[in-house]
């Protein structure tokens, strides 16, 4: 027999159970703290590469020596469009919404107002997840693939800082040198990227191989020297703190957030980890990367004129007929770009 609702029995709706995953934004909120909405379609970044030249010694009677400028390059990016929307039809407003009492007496207009808030939250969550995915892609691969209906391109930041271990040098191999790798890589970041790395974010398999490594276990068990501490604990925003190494000085983290990939193979969508299983990311905890938003341009319904808005989010609603329906859409142009260099690595 079907589980029918008896409208004559006293009932109480305790709550609406929404089985939706939380929105995790660790990479976006931690590393891309320099948020800048632009008023233009494209975002240009001038890159000035410094060096470690020192001022020359000169004789007092000879005068100074010119320290020549290094010059700069300009990178130009066109932020991709993210434009999710939802549709509300008249028949949806005539029936009870999730969480509404059977005899609430809500009018269609009141339901429309409540549904608008719920729709915006859904659209905003989807856009936020895309921003987090873009932030991770930029740091891990140095590229952001823009794949969707009518678009297939790649934003390439020109990274030359990816390292791939091969054969028995891989973590878990017979010639693996995990602690030596981390020391060499932090030195490489300091030399080539002018950044002091203090964090290592490990993928799932990289984390397993790190803790299973005999040299790591031996170092952690050395009671005569404080070479580090393993003290795993959960942190907000889906992050797990694993412990600390003293040489090289690194805090170790894992980030288990996943995303739903329905564009690589639309016939077989899959849930994938944001951080590749074998990845090791070395990064500064305060890089101040930029989140640069392009301008949002649309036709204003009342005036019929084109309007450009300098914002990270544009929420708009408009009406269509035959059948009558209200469209609610969110528009954003969210790329990510850099103010200086850091070197993630892949093991």
Identify the meaning behind each predicted range.
Residues 1-43, 341:
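N-terminal alpha-helical "arm" segments
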Residues 31-56, 262, 280-281, 316-317, ...:
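Basic/polar low-complexity intrinsically disordered segments
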Residues 33-102:
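Assembly/oligomerization interface modules of large self-assembling protein complexes
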Residues 275-334:
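C-terminal structured domain segments
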Residues 339-345:
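Conserved small/polar residues in nucleotide/adenosyl-binding loops
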């Amino acid at each position: 027999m079907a589980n029918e609702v008896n409208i004559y029995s006293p009932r109480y709706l305790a709550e609406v159970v929404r089985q939706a995953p939380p929105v995790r934004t660790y990479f976006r909120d931690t590393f891309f703290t320099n948020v800048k909405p632009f008023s233009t379609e494209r975002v240009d970044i001038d890159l000035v590469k410094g060096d470690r030249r020192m001022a020359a010694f000169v004789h007092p009677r000879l005068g100074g020596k010119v320290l020549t400028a290094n010059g700069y390059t300009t990178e130009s990016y066109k932020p991709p469009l993210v434009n999710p929307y939802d549709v509300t039809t008249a028949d949806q407003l005539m029936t009870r919404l999730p969480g509404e009492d059977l005899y609430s007496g809500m009018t269609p207009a009141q339901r429309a107002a409540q549904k608008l808030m719920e729709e915006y939250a859904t659209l905003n969550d989807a856009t936020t997840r895309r921003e987090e995915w873009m932030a991770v892609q930029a740091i891990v691969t140095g590229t952001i693939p823009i794949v969707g209906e009518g678009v297939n391109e790649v934003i390439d930041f020109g990274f030359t800082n990816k390292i791939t271990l091969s054969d028995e040098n891989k973590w878990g191999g017979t010639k693996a040198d995990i602690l030596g790798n981390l020391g060499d890589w932090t030195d490489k970041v300091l030399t080539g990227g002018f950044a002091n790395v203090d964090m290592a974010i490990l993928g799932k398999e990289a984390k397993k191989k790190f803790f299973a490594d005999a040299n790591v276990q031996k170092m952690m068990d050395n009671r005569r020297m404080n070479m580090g501490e393993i003290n795993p604990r959960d942190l907000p925003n889906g992050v797990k703190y694993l412990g600390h190494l003293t040489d090289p000085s690194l805090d170790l983290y894992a980030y288990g957030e996943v995303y739903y990939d329905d564009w690589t193979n639309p016939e077989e969508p899959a849930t994938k980890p944001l951080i590749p299983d074998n990845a090791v990311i070395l990064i500064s905890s305060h890089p101040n990367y930029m989140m640069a938003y392009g301008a949002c341009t649309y036709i204003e319904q009342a005036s019929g004129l084109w309007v450009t808005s300098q914002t990270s989010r544009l929420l708009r609603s408009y009406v269509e007929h035959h059948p009558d329906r209200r469209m609610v859409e969110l528009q954003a142009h969210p790329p990510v770009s850099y103010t200086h260099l850091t070197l993630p690595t892949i093991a």
